[in-house]
């Protein structure tokens, strides 16, 4: 399995690779170049899931943000944890990945990316989302998936 090592020398799991890709894109890197770079690291058997999670999270980014906000008691100021939540929620709400696998792998990804102290938060929020799934389908369905500045401008016009 070809996965990239991180600081401790262990390999990153698929969800951690997805989070790293999403963070790179959010920081202004080209999706095509980041995808090509990471596709070479991800194992052959995981490439389809990797591709689906990256593109799906990007497609649903603003909707996932709207789903996440009510689950938090205070806003997150940590892009790694926030992105882990989006990856986990996307799996739970938009794919057929088993809930226990989505949660476990996403929590492990947060640990692998240096967020061990906040991995409990990721776990708690994703578990809560599995209990309250129906209300989040409504949020996803009604979300515009447009950046707030663009949605406001379109409403104005």
Task: Locate each region found by the language model.
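Class I Rossmann-like S-adenosyl-L-methionine
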Residues: 1-157
